[in-house]
């Protein structure tokens, strides 16, 4: 039976601070991770995500604050005595040892009785479907197999939390996609809390129960992949996760609790937001490429849509991506449509005049002042 995340924190970071010299990386940082969750700590280079992982692993010392593991304060517990294991980007397998000995290494260091070691190692190898590789050396394995061995070596110690540090980045695209699925299935099977650190937003969306997106040592947003993609808290989040188009808007009037009449790039239309607004207030309307609708127009045809022309198009198999340049200000937007070869209006020509609208209610509305 698949493990489901439980509403009980297995990890708590309480007001932690870490500096390197005069450079403060994280300050007054708080985070709780529930038992059985697959959490991805995501962010650009220098945001503090690797520092958080190293603090959890016990590879760095806190300046202040505390780390709680399953109700126990482990702030001053050395790395080797924490029930936390790490899979590094390099996998760090011993090339002179067999796969069996690589996986058994941690158990031998803990002086686990020999009669326990073999069944535990074989069980771990069975979990990652590499039991038949036990007598081989790491150099005889593919990158994906080496990654699974690194995971087996980590889980054989039965940790409460498994940390993964950019551990898919060395794989080619096809294998990386496969390993994303396998990691998620393995995490459900093992029932261990996984904390995955990456800068790759596609990996985060694909695998995670929850994403913690960092910016300059602070949590920019903490939520499910769907929440972060469909309801970004600010412009940084929207731009970091997927493609986004940002339209300038001016409030005309509030029509109801949820609906505001606005001028969006010259188009007078309803936008959906419950935030307090005033007449003439500046807003930003965020639209994903797949939220936008293109209508082909004759050169003299009237339309209430935002008018522009196709300046680029890219066929991507299932989708057609078009770049539209607005006539009124030269702004460019990206539009993604599911490709329908039977639709004569689908494959837009360069230079085609078009009207731009969007699926009503799919927009995200932000206060312009919040996104500086």
Swiss-Prot record:
Belongs to the ABC transporter superfamily. Spermidine/putrescine importer (TC 3.A.1.11.1) family. It comes from Haemophilus influenzae (strain 86-028NP). It is a peripheral membrane protein. It catalyses: ATP + H2O + polyamine-[polyamine-binding protein]Side 1 = ADP + phosphate + polyamineSide 2 + [polyamine-binding protein]Side 1. ATP binds at residues 43-50. The keyword Ligase does not apply. Gene3D superfamilies: 2.40.50.100, P-loop containing nucleotide triphosphate hydrolases. The lineage of its organism: Bacteria, Pseudomonadati, Pseudomonadota, Gammaproteobacteria, Pasteurellales. Transmembrane segments: none annotated. Keywords: ATP-binding, Cell inner membrane, Cell membrane, Membrane, Nucleotide-binding, Translocase, Transport. One of its GO terms (cellular component) is ATP-binding cassette (ABC) transporter complex. Pfam families: ABC_tran, TOBE_2. The complex is composed of two ATP-binding proteins (PotA), two transmembrane proteins (PotB and PotC) and a solute-binding protein (PotD). Its EC number is 7.6.2.11. The gene is potA. Residues 11-241 form the ABC transporter domain. The keyword Metal-binding does not apply. Part of the ABC transporter complex PotABCD involved in spermidine/putrescine import. Responsible for energy coupling to the transport system. InterPro entries: AAA+_ATPase (IPR003593), ABC_SmlMolc_Importer (IPR050093), ABC_transporter-like_ATP-bd (IPR003439), ABC_transporter-like_CS (IPR017871), Mo/tungstate-bd_C_term_dom (IPR008995), P-loop_NTPase (IPR027417), PotA-like (IPR005893), PotA_ATP-bd (IPR017879). One of its GO terms (molecular function) is ABC-type putrescine transporter activity. This is Spermidine/putrescine import ATP-binding protein PotA. It is found in: Cell inner membrane.
